[in-house]
Curated annotation (Swiss-Prot):
This is Endoribonuclease YbeY. Binds 1 zinc ion. PANTHER family: ENDORIBONUCLEASE YBEY, CHLOROPLASTIC (PTHR46986:SF1). Single strand-specific metallo-endoribonuclease involved in late-stage 70S ribosome quality control and in maturation of the 3' terminus of the 16S rRNA. Its EC number is 3.1.-.-. Gene3D superfamilies: Metalloproteases ('zincins'), catalytic domain. Zn(2+) binds at H125, H129, H135. NCBIfam families: rRNA maturation RNase YbeY (TIGR00043). It comes from Brevibacillus brevis (strain 47 / JCM 6285 / NBRC 100599). The gene is ybeY. InterPro entries: MetalPrtase_cat_dom_sf_prd (IPR023091), YbeY (IPR002036), YbeY_CS (IPR020549). Keywords: Cytoplasm, Endonuclease, Hydrolase, Metal-binding, Nuclease, Ribosome biogenesis, rRNA processing, Zinc. Its cofactor is Zn(2+).
Length: 159
């Protein structure tokens, strides 16, 4: 099972239908990847994601989505090992996904598809990053984007 919390930071909350769409996207991706755990999705404005992108990635501009995986130790952090028998006592906190709502609107218009489709795409994209997928090479990109499309097609968010 996947536990999802949706937060709004410095923006008006999105409606309940869109929140349910995000949960459906994450549940479908978790099922495809056979993973359980907890995810927090925070919806923000361009100023906030710009700040986070600058502070954590050293990129001084807004972006569409950021992912902060909790299962990967950060620079200078110790890796924590838990006995397999005890692991079930702790929640599997997968991480945080931060999405710029204004960027999602802008990109939906640029790509000629719905805001819902773009928001779903960014949600699944961020989730796959939490699981370690990347798109730094053509092979990685092909793998990641094919998984994204599979999830989006499954829930009816086609182009």
């Amino acid at each position: 099972m996947l536990s999802v919390e949706i937060l709004h930071e410095e923006i008006e909350p999105i409606d309940e239908n869109l929140q349910n769409l995000l949960v459906r996207c994450l549940e479908a991706a978790a099922k495809l990847e056979e993973v359980q755990g907890e995810v927090v999705v925070t919806l923000v404005n361009n100023e906030r994601i710009h700040e986070l992108n600058r502070d954590y990635r050293g990129v001084d501009r807004p972006t569409d989505v950021l992912s902060f995986a909790m299962n990967e130790p950060g620079e200078g952090e110790m890796e924590i090992f838990i006995d397999e028998d005890e692991a079930s006592e702790f929640p599997n906190m997968l991480g945080d996904i931060i999405i710029s709502v204004p960027k999602a609107h802008e990109q939906a218009e640029d790509y000629g598809h719905s805001f819902e489709r773009e928001l779903g795409f960014l949600t699944v994209h961020g989730f796959l990053h939490l699981l370690g997928y990347d798109h730094g090479t053509p092979e990685e990109e092909k793998e990641m984007f094919s998984r994204q499309e599979k999830v989006l097609e499954e829930i009816g968010l086609t182009r």
